[in-house]
Curated annotation (Swiss-Prot):
Belongs to the TIM54 family. Component of the TIM22 complex, whose core is composed of TIM22 and TIM54, associated with the 70 kDa heterohexamer composed of TIM9 and TIM10 (or TIM8 and TIM13). InterPro entries: Mt_import_IM_translocase_Tim54. The chain crosses the membrane at residues 13-30. It comes from Schizosaccharomyces pombe (strain 972 / ATCC 24843) (Fission yeast). The lineage of its organism: Eukaryota, Fungi, Dikarya, Ascomycota, Taphrinomycotina. This is Mitochondrial import inner membrane translocase subunit tim54. It comes from the Eukaryota. It is a single-pass membrane protein.
Length: 347
């Protein structure tokens, strides 16, 4: 009988393989199950917000979420983290949000700078029909907030605020964009008149686009004097979520460790999301760079970004909060205290 059973048992090598596969599968299953339980735990903490009554014409609370691709990778990294870990908690709290996606160094900065500039000069970004509709509706009594994922997005947002307060740079940028739009219209007219030169015109257009892109990049890193500071309550409270993204073959052991510990990331992100939903643990902008501003994330970035010749003039690697004028400029900005959220998890 034993000989018969033994004949059906796998050999030594197959047993090792099956044991290895079973161990890996079990670790993944346990981690994903714990991750889902953690997210559900945080959803249950904010679900009562969805049950609160609202006035007939009252708008729900709205957040603005900036999704920006991390250095060396695509926008999908930020998008997947938000969809998997953060969005379920906001949905459970019945919080409305608007996502703004961008990728590439400087793109988010331009969007924020334009929004800040328009707000300072009372330039409305809302169409007339929307204005008429909003005049009838009541704004939410709960405060809005801004959600940023990653150290790179935080840097671009703050530099965007800085450039939005620099009227000279913004006026120059707007004039450049207007000139580019006029040139584009002229080229389209020429292409319509002369079909034979389509290929040459398209090549010229590509070259002009490259040149204009470089000109915009150089204007983004141009030094501008800081005067005064951001007025209190000018910006909504900022929520800073970590976006760990380690690349490279040499970092495989560390990447595998993170892969099997997604539950820890869910715990960290969930605690911050609950603070945002409940509007608690709000603090002033720190006077020095550190953990609260995700300074440790820069060690995960590809080394190629730190070996560039214009290292100190690029947005992601430029000196940050090292000038007293810069610290004073941002000191009226409110942010959610992510370090307090980490402490509350274990209490």
């Amino acid at each position: 009988m034993l000989k018969t059973i033994k004949s059906y048992m796998p050999g030594r090598n197959m047993s090792i393989f099956l044991g290895f596969v079973a161990g890996i599968s079990g670790a993944i299953y346990y981690d994903r199950r714990q991750k889902n339980l953690i997210i559900e735990k945080y959803c249950s903490q904010v679900r009562h917000l969805a049950d609160q009554p609202m006035a007939p014409l009252e708008l729900p609370r709205k957040l603005k979420v900036y999704l920006h691709g991390p250095p060396g990778d695509g926008i999908y990294v930020a998008r997947e983290e938000f969809e998997e870990y953060i969005r379920p908690i906001f949905n459970a709290a019945a919080i409305e949000f608007e996502t703004v996606e961008s990728k590439g160094e400087g793109n988010l900065l331009e969007q924020v700078a334009r929004t800040v500039y328009n707000k300072r000069h009372n330039i409305s970004e809302v169409s007339e029909p929307e204005k008429n509709l909003l005049s009838v509706l009541k704004p939410s009594v709960d405060p809005p907030a801004i959600v940023l994922l990653g150290r790179h997005a935080l840097k671009e947002f703050l530099y965007g605020v800085r450039y939005g307060f620099s009227d000279d740079i913004m006026k120059r940028k707007l004039e450049t964009e207007k000139l580019e739009a006029n040139n584009k219209e002229e080229k389209e007219e020429k292409e319509g008149k002369d079909d034979k030169d389509d290929k040459e015109d398209s090549n010229d257009t590509k070259n002009d686009k490259k040149i204009s892109k470089n000109e915009v990049d150089s204007s983004l890193i141009e030094a501008s004097p800081l005067t005064g500071q951001v007025p209190p309550k000018f910006l909504d409270t900022i929520a800073i979520f970590p976006l760990p993204n380690l690349l490279g073959f040499s970092n495989t052991p560390k990447r595998l460790s993170r892969f099997f510990k997604r539950r820890e990331l869910a715990d960290e992100l969930g605690a911050i999301a609950v603070n945002v939903a409940l509007s608690r643990d709000v603090t002033k902008f720190p006077k020095q760079d550190g953990t609260l501003l995700l300074a440790e994330e820069e060690t995960d970035w590809p080394k190629q970004f730190f070996t560039r010749s214009d290292l100190e003039n690029r947005i992601w690697t430029a000196p940050f909060l090292q000038d007293s004028d810069e610290i004073r400029f941002f000191e009226n900005i409110d942010i959610f205290d992510s370090t307090k959220a980490k402490q509350d998890k274990y209490e």
